[in-house]
Amino acid sequence: MKPLFLQIKCELGQTFKVAADFIDTVKETSEVYSTSGAYDLLGKFYLEEDQNVGRFVVEHIHRIPGIRDTYTLMAFRIFCDEQPDGLVERG
């Protein structure tokens, strides 16, 4: 699985509905956070290794009503105390 982060700008008053729609309808959703700054939400998604990121964003994210803009961030490696595969990544 490959992680994908999306910053999401919502129409005024639609942030909570958009977040709920992600959780209810996009199976790849891992977490959705409300944020301060230029974007209203930060979504974390896990895609299959062969899944096309651009197609996923267009077909699954942009179709949700209330979204005004998105910014896609690709993640390559996780650094934490415990890796999902049991390995620790330090430097």
Region spans (language model):
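A compositional/biophysical signature of low hydrophobicity enriched in polar/charged and small residues
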Residues: 1-91
